Every structure is written in C-alpha cells, then in structure tokens.
Swiss-Prot record:
Electron transport in keyword set: yes
PROSITE patterns reported in the protein's UniProt record: CYTB_CTER
Pfam families hit by this protein: Cytochrom_B_C (PF00032)
Xref: InterPro entries: Cyt_b/b6_C (IPR005798), Cyt_b/b6_C_sf (IPR036150), Cyt_b6/f_cplx_suIV (IPR005870), Cytochrome_b_C_euk/bac (IPR048260)
The name this protein goes by in its record: Cytochrome b6-f complex subunit 4
GO MF annotation: an example: ubiquinol-cytochrome-c reductase activity
Swiss-Prot/TrEMBL keywords: Electron transport, Membrane, Photosynthesis, Thylakoid, Transmembrane, Transmembrane helix, Transport
Length: 160
C-alpha cells in the first residue's frame, strides 16, 4: 500500500500543465550565471584585497633570527600541548604522570555510566556530565596557563 500518490503521466491535463512549465519552481535566483559569474568573483577578489591590504599596511614582524648557539632558558612545546606538558613537569614520578594522562580518557568514558539519562534529554540538565565538563575545561586552562610560567610559579600561577 503506497502512502504517496504517484502522478499519472498519461493524464492529458497533467501533460498540458507540464508542457507549459508548471510543476517547476521558478522563484528565487538561479545560481548560473548570477552567483558563479558575479557574486563569487567579487567575494574572492575582496578577500584577496583584504589580505594584501593587511600584509602591506600592517606587516607581521618576524621573530629574532635563529641562533644555534643560544639555547632558550626553557623550551616549551606547542600551545595545545601545554596542559600535558604541565602534568609531566609537575608530577615527580614520570610513570605517575603517564598514568594520570591515561586516566583522563578512562574517566571521561565512565561519565555516561555514572549518570542515567534519556538520550533525547537536554544536555544542560545532566548535572554530572556538565560538572565534569566544566571542571575539566577549567582545569585544562589552569594547566595551560601554568605551563607557560616558570616551574616555581606554575602551580600558583604566580598569585601567591
């Protein structure tokens, strides 16, 4: 049993309407040639003009020249590795530091089992998951800021 009624293409009234162009929507604006020939080049050239203007008017200053004989005081990883670097730097036992980093994904995998919820429920009404997320985000930012500071100020962020 079909729910949708298929059109009868042998019907002369329907054939007459289709012959006049009815059945197709002609509202709106066609992509060809309006978008492809007029709007896209304007956007592309405008973007290139903005980039060139910024490069000419405000050139980015390069860092100091590389000196192979001058080692920096503290070598830092890329910014996205700061929290991991801080954990390894602060924990006295390196095996414990690796174990702590292994426990982070394991703890995140346990969150759905700790809190019973409906999968269609609003995620803002899941207090355990929200608390874990907010604490994890704040702690990651704390570790990232601490990694950029010297080791003696890294835990207190230089506030105490």
């Amino acid at each position: 049993m079909h729910i949708l009624k298929e059109p009868d293409l042998n019907d002369p009234k329907l054939r007459a309407k289709l012959a006049k162009g009815m059945g197709h929507n002609y509202y709106g604006e066609p992509a060809w040639p309006n978008d492809l020939l007029y709007i896209f080049p304007v956007v592309i050239l405008g973007t290139i003009a903005c980039v060139v203007a910024l490069a000419v008017l405000d050139p980015a200053m390069l860092a100091d020249k590389a000196d192979p004989f001058a080692t920096p005081l503290e070598i830092l990883p890329e910014w996205y590795l700061y929290p991991v670097f801080q954990i390894l730097r602060v924990v006295p036992n390196k095996l414990l530091g690796i174990a702590l980093q292994t426990m982070i994904p394991l703890g995140l995998m346990l969150v759905p089992f700790i809190e019973s919820f409906n999968k269609f429920q609003n995620p803002f009404r899941r207090p355990v998951a929200m608390a874990v997320f907010l604490f994890g985000t704040a702690f990651t930012i704390y570790l990232g800021i601490g990694a950029a500071l010297p080791i003696d100020k890294s835990l207190t962020l230089g506030l105490f």
